[in-house]
Amino acid sequence: MVGAERLREVDRIVAAVHAWAVTDEQVHAVAVVGSYAAGRPGMSSDLDLVIVASAPKRLLPDIDCVSAAVGVHAAPVRERDWGRLRERRFRTPTGLDIDLGIVALSWLGTPVDPGTARVLRDGCQIVFDPEGVTAETLHSLGVTVRHWAGMQ
């Protein structure tokens, strides 16, 4: 079970990512996926965020951009490719791991890739989606559209 302080930390980080996303014109959408989105995080759960961008490669090398996005000093831990998703993992001073998955807009395109569909079906809450691209993809998968608290 996750304590109240960890939940507040996650909410602060998600709010900071939202504030950053609305200022970056290449960001089309942001969503929380995984255990926090599904409502079943544990103390060892990481915070998984997917950032949908028009130019994902431009976001990758800029560590300052990522630190600004998460709103706290977060040390880089690793980078990994998961097919069309490029993951950057960071760790906060409290030990919370944040996985930022950066993808192109085509990641949400139809037909939806089986890996993408699994990620979205396993838990997805929209943080930022001004064009409705995430909501449209969730609808196409028969997944209920849910927004992170206060991010509608």
Stretch-by-stretch model annotation:
Residues 11, 15, 64-67, 142, ...:
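Generic detector of well-ordered alpha-helical segments enriched in charged/polar residues
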Residues 1, 15-22, 55-60, 66-71:
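A generic short-segment signal for beta-strand/edge and adjacent turn/coil regions
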Residues 34-69, 95-97, 101:
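Catalytic metal-binding acidic patch
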Residues 1-6, 69-152:
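Conserved NTP/Mg2+-binding pocket subregion across the NTase superfamily
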